[in-house]
UniProtKB/Swiss-Prot annotation:
Active site residues according to the UniProt entry: T13
HAMAP family listed in its UniProt record: HslV
Protein name in the entry: ATP-dependent protease subunit HslV
Membrane spanning residue stretches: none
Broad class of where this protein is predominantly found: cytoplasm
GO molecular function terms attached to this record: metal ion binding; threonine-type endopeptidase activity
Species of the source: Allorhizobium ampelinum (strain ATCC BAA-846 / DSM 112012 / S4) (Agrobacterium vitis (strain S4))
UniProt EC number: 3.4.25.2
Amino acid sequence: MSEHNPYGTMHGTTIITVRKGGMVVMAGDGQVSLGQTVMKGNARKVRRIGKGEVIAGFAGATADAFTLLERLEKKLEQYPGQLMRAAVELAKDWRTDKYLRNLEAMMLVADKTVTLAITGNGDVLEPEHGTIAIGSGGNYALAAALALMDTEKSAEEVARKAMKIAADICVYTNENVLVETLESAN
């Protein structure tokens, strides 16, 4: 049981970002589980923020993730067009603020130039190959996507196939996948 949630740990999601062929794609499943129960199958965990120039996806406690998304949007207003700077400033706040420190979530964010994972430990990580995944099925999705990167598949096809594979393996991930895309500068 989580110290913040008397019903047990909230599980369930897989979020992946794939950067390939001039596109950046973020995909996430719709399942929200509480303990061993599926609470919702069509949650929207991937969305556009920052005037539509940034895509963001989250894993973890939903209310916590929304709090962090709101904070990131404020940082993007403060540092327009500077996703890396906004993410680092959010991570600093997350790590040092007494209230934020207790939030249980992780985020992937991407714009036309950079993809980042932001964690509650204050980490801002840029993936080595432009592909990264988080959540309960994240490792399965990441392995599948990396295996598909040298194929003729588009970034969206790679992301969708990786999500399908993760959903086949991870009980906390479903096949109700939402995808957001942006043109990539690299």
